[in-house]
């Protein structure tokens, strides 16, 4: 196993099975964040993650963190909160604001640089990257974004500026995703937060098998059309 240097003249990636064990999943470096390369990466179970000012690093960890939408864990307190939620939830209304929110609301710093913001915004304009927005009145207070691969959604990041805002985004999205044929959410690497929401780890080979099947699936043509998913009860 060795770290592969990508060429700017080819969007090809090495097999994820060749990724390093330590650091877990590091597969390649270099290349660029062009839409074609990003889409090729997601189709192969690979994602970018790197520090500002450093070379682009590409990862495919083993095990892989995933969330089966029907297994989303909602605490009793969250269920009570959602019943009287003051939030309105939309899809693809404000992709730029959501990714900017994910970039700026990180006390420990962020990998979401200006170049990353621009790259995913291009994916959004091409219909591949999508956002869920949580509004309190007319203020954006939380949200999440990711990349669609058929009936699998690759979650990238979320943010919250008010109580339970990001959890609301995930809850409403999971309900909508399941009801329209969505199968699986990729969480990349397990952490305490995603584990508390019901995410689990599966072997990389299993994730790649699911990906190869699900990316060929189709949600309804109008699923990603900008629309309101949830409104507070009056």
From Swiss-Prot:
Entry superkingdom: Bacteria
Protein name: Leucyl/phenylalanyl-tRNA--protein transferase
Reactions accelerated catalytically: N-terminal L-lysyl-[protein] + L-leucyl-tRNA(Leu) = N-terminal L-leucyl-L-lysyl-[protein] + tRNA(Leu) + H(+); N-terminal L-arginyl-[protein] + L-leucyl-tRNA(Leu) = N-terminal L-leucyl-L-arginyl-[protein] + tRNA(Leu) + H(+); L-phenylalanyl-tRNA(Phe) + an N-terminal L-alpha-aminoacyl-[protein] = an N-terminal L-phenylalanyl-L-alpha-aminoacyl-[protein] + tRNA(Phe)
Keywords per UniProt: Acyltransferase, Cytoplasm, Transferase
Pfam families (UniProt xref): Leu_Phe_trans (PF03588)
Family, per entry: Belongs to the L/F-transferase family.
Main location: cytoplasm
Tagged with keyword Acyltransferase: yes
GO terms, molecular function: leucyl-tRNA--protein transferase activity
Species name: Shigella sonnei (strain Ss046)
Gene Ontology cellular-component annotations: cytoplasm
